[in-house]
Swiss-Prot record:
The lineage of its organism: Bacteria, Bacillati, Bacillota, Bacilli, Lactobacillales. Mg(2+) binds at H136. Homohexamer. Gene3D superfamilies: 3.40.50.2020. Coiled coil: none annotated. Pfam families: Pribosyl_synth, Pribosyltran_N. This is Putative ribose-phosphate pyrophosphokinase 2. One of its GO terms (molecular function) is ATP binding. D-ribose 5-phosphate binds at D225, N229, T230, G231, K232, T233.
Length: 326
């Protein structure tokens, strides 16, 4: 059992979106979750009460802004305000999943940049720092005028696949879309494996027309993406890989939303195993071949390092056994 963290000036609070990961983070950090209550009135309004003193403390609020996105976002904003009014020393937010991060640019005329709007709201509410996990677009960090620590899950995935023996030239890491090349290359470098990309003649509306850039024939393929939403991207990519001669297909994503009947889509796809982190607690049905890999130890270590003013750089890498550290 993890020993109790000595400094009692740091406090962790969990809101309602993902209590399981918050409990794991608290256990890994050796810091019990603070006492608070959150309730929603019949008219939809949210009321929060912090049931212990936070005066002069460094506060870390854990909340994934997943579905219901707007309720979870407002609960977070209200909790931030409660901490500020209770004279907390610093108010830091831990977002295992950052909702609205995909709305990071104007893709069509007269569209908003909602990720920037959310960043403005959180900053205006009075936060001092953001800790998050695998932002959809890393430039979202620049939407804040405060420190943002964007932790990477690729080292966790690399360690998992290395233990399963999925590495080397017999494995190919595949990006199911051209925007995910950097993520695929990062995992491939850890596994000493080649990469491949699934591209499309026009757009994603005709996924069956996708073609592969790279060699997957006779290899075990690992599809990697940041968000698993409806499952269609993975399902169609797996079919393309199967037609192209891949022997087995695995899939991995940082955030498993499993929205819109994703389980039905994925269970009919030729995918042996799907790995996601526990960044999102979903009420939707999850496919039987899904394995959850907890990001709680990574987040807990980041929180302690931030509090102790130590560097986070050791958290951004994984050194496979047998490799020279020199």
């Amino acid at each position: 059992m993890t020993e109790r963290y000595a400094d009692k000036q740091i406090k962790l609070f969990s809101l309602t979106s993902n209590l399981p990961i918050a409990e794991k983070i608290a256990k890994a950090a050796g810091i019990p979750l603070g006492k608070m209550s959150s309730r929603q009135f019949s008219n939809g309004e949210i009321m929060i009460n912090i049931e212990e003193t936070v005066r002069g403390d460094d506060i870390y609020i854990i909340q994934s802004t997943s579905f219901p996105v707007n309720d979870n976002l407002w609960e977070l904003l209200i909790m931030i305000d409660a901490c500020k009014r209770a004279s907390a020393n610093t108010v830091n937010i831990v977002l295992p999943y950052f909702g609205y991060s995909r709305q990071d640019r104007v893709a069509k005329p007269r569209e908003p940049i909602t990720a920037k709007l959310v960043a403005n709201m959180l900053t205006k509410a009075g936060i001092d720092r953001v800790v998050t996990l695998d932002l959809h677009a890393v430039q979202v960090q620049g939407f804040f005028d405060i420190p943002v620590d964007n932790l990477f899950t690729v080292p966790l995935f690399a360690e998992r696949y290395s233990k399963l023996g999925l590495s080397g030239s017999d494995v190919v890491v595949v990006s199911p879309k051209n925007s995910g090349i950097k993520r695929a290359r990062s995992l491939a470098e850890y596994l000493d494996s080649p990469i491949a990309i699934i591209d499309y003649a026009q757009d994603d509306s005709e996924r069956e027309q996708g073609y592969i850039i790279g060699d997957v024939s006779g290899k075990k393929a690992i599809l990697i993406d940041d968000i698993l939403n409806t499952g269609k991207t993975f399902a169609e990519a797996a079919k393309i890989l199967e037609r192209s001669g891949a022997t087995d297909t695995y899939a991995v994503a940082s955030h498993g939303l499993f929205a819109g009947g994703a389980a039905d889509v994925l269970e009919t796809a030729p995918i042996k195993e799907i790995i996601v982190t526990d960044s999102v607690k979903t009420k939707n049905r999850v496919p039987e071949n899904v394995t959850y890999l907890s990001a709680s130890d990574l987040i807990a270590e980041a929180i302690i390092r931030i509090h102790e003013r130590r560097p986070l750089s050791p958290l951004f890498s994984y050194q496979p056994k047998g490799k020279n550290n020199a």
